[in-house]
Amino acid sequence: LDVGCGGGQLIEDIAKSVGIAGKAIGIDPSSSQISSAKELCSGLENTLFICCLANNIDLESESVDAVASIQTFEYIDDIDEALTEIKRLLKPRAKFLNISTLWDYYRFHGPEKKLNDLMHDVFKEHCSHQMVPTFLNGRLKNLGFKDIKTTELAYVFTKRDENSFAKYAETLIANFALSKGVEKDKVSEWQKQIKK
């Protein structure tokens, strides 16, 4: 089960990995994302997509072997409700994998600190929880999850080209800032500065 499956890229890989004897299930609250996922996986017979929130998944208790959540819990208002639902769905000794970003540490560093801070502070509004990895283990323990392990994955981008994640993130942040009312000239200046 992929919680917050988006366009279905991970479900496609899971479905191919588990083969026809298994099933890859994706959930997402966005009907347009579910439509995209269904289209991407249309040639696979072992997929199921459900448009729903993570706290109310229409599946039987103890029915899934593993749950993945990639960059999802940042956007869930009530994390405990979603974790309780995931725990309900997991078979005994099944695995839950979560990957989350420490968004408060995710930033670009151009020469003008005030402008960088403005863009960083505005982008904080893009999700409900900026620092999921700092508290998730405690929540999991309180809800009865066992064998909790954390692996830190640090990454630093040293090159920025048109095909890099840094360029994608810059565009995402710029568009978000514009949607929140930051003046276009400030956003353009920020983009110009971080290109240097």
Can you name each region flagged by the protein language model?
Residues 97-162, 176-179:
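Conserved catalytic/acceptor-binding region of the Class I
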Residues 65-78:
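A short SAM/SAH-binding and catalytic strip from SAM-dependent methyltransferases
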Residues 55-66:
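A short acidic, Gly/Pro-enriched loop at the edge of an enzyme's catalytic core
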Residues 80-92:
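A short glycine-rich, Lys/Arg-flanked "PGG" loop and its adjoining helix->strand segment in the class I
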Residues 20-21, 90-95:
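Short glycine-dipeptide loop
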Residues 143, 166-196:
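C-terminal lobe and adjacent flexible extensions of AdoMet/dcAdoMet transferase-like proteins
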Residues 1, 7-56:
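Class I SAM-dependent methyltransferase SAM/SAH-binding core
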